[in-house]
Amino acid sequence: MALVTKLLVASRNRKKLAELRRVLDGAGLSGLTLLSLGDVSPLPETPETGVTFEDNALAKARDAFSATGLASVADDSGLEVAALGGMPGVLSARWSGRYGDDAANTALLLAQLCDVPDERRGAAFVSACALVSGSGEVVVRGEWPGTIAREPRGDGGFGYDPVFVPYGDDRTAAQLSPAEKDAVSHRGRALALLLPALRSLATG
């Protein structure tokens, strides 16, 4: 009987977890069983005190691995807007001062960009994914370039998706199907870079 390796996805964000599951499942990684934080004993929240996405992703994966002994993957992601000097960056989820309030965060972002012309509204979604296991640590980064729309459009996705228009498209990320988003998104790109390490884990 083939051994099954348990992989802990260290996130409490259900929408992010679903996206991670879709991408990993779509890669056809046999031999891996995905677990969420809800499947293990309660873990303390890892504070996002890093100055980079990589710092935060690695801290979350390290904490999960240390607490459970399970190979753990974690993501930290956000939006970098050129006209705002790369902000909100690692502060994306709490840009308005209220953690996880997507509507408030988006409203503040649009207000800050209200006088910025279209040609200067460039931005990129960034995702850093970290894998920590008994074999070591791997950290990768994916970016999804685009621009910021002037008003929200679409009901899909989460976070800043309704105002992010990927280069080469006229729809926002919130107007893409899950499959379309997974194929091109920052998280999808980061996970694609992580797949060799995950395959080694599954066959190890």
Swiss-Prot record:
> For Mg(2+), which residues are the binding ones?
D76
- InterPro entries of this UniProt entry? dITP/XTP_pyrophosphatase, ITPase-like_fam, RdgB/HAM1
**Catalytic residues identified in the record:** D76
Query: What SUPFAM superfamilies does the record point to?
Result: ITPase-like
The answer to whether UniProt assigns keyword Metal-binding to this entry is yes
The EC code for this enzyme is 3.6.1.66
Which Pfam family name is an example for this entry?
Ham1p_like
Q: Which residues bind substrate?
A: S11, R12, N13, R14, K15, K16, S77, F158, G159, Y160, D161, K181, H186, R187
What keywords would UniProt list here? Hydrolase, Magnesium, Metal-binding, Nucleotide metabolism, Nucleotide-binding
Record text on cofactor binding:
Binds 1 Mg(2+) ion per subunit.
Provide the cofactor list for this protein.
Mg(2+)
Gene Ontology molecular-function annotations: dITP diphosphatase activity; ITP diphosphatase activity; metal ion binding; nucleoside triphosphate diphosphatase activity; nucleotide binding; ribonucleoside triphosphate phosphatase activity; XTP diphosphatase activity
Q: Which reaction does it catalyse?
A: XTP + H2O = XMP + diphosphate + H(+); dITP + H2O = dIMP + diphosphate + H(+); ITP + H2O = IMP + diphosphate + H(+)
A GO BP entry: nucleoside triphosphate catabolic process
Q: Which residues cross the membrane?
A: none
Q: What GO cellular component entries does it have?
A: cytoplasm; cytosol
Q: What does this protein do?
A: Pyrophosphatase that catalyzes the hydrolysis of nucleoside triphosphates to their monophosphate derivatives, with a high preference for the non-canonical purine nucleotides XTP (xanthosine triphosphate), dITP (deoxyinosine triphosphate) and ITP. Seems to function as a house-cleaning enzyme that removes non-canonical purine nucleotides from the nucleotide pool, thus preventing their incorporation into DNA/RNA and avoiding chromosomal lesions.
What is the annotated quaternary arrangement, including any partners?
Answer: Homodimer.
- UniProt-listed HAMAP family: Non_canon_purine_NTPase
Q: Which family does the entry's similarity section mention?
A: Belongs to the HAM1 NTPase family.
Q: Which NCBIfam families match?
A: RdgB/HAM1 family non-canonical purine NTP pyrophosphatase
Q: What is the protein name given in its UniProt record?
A: dITP/XTP pyrophosphatase
Which organism does this record belong to? Mycobacterium tuberculosis (strain ATCC 25618 / H37Rv)
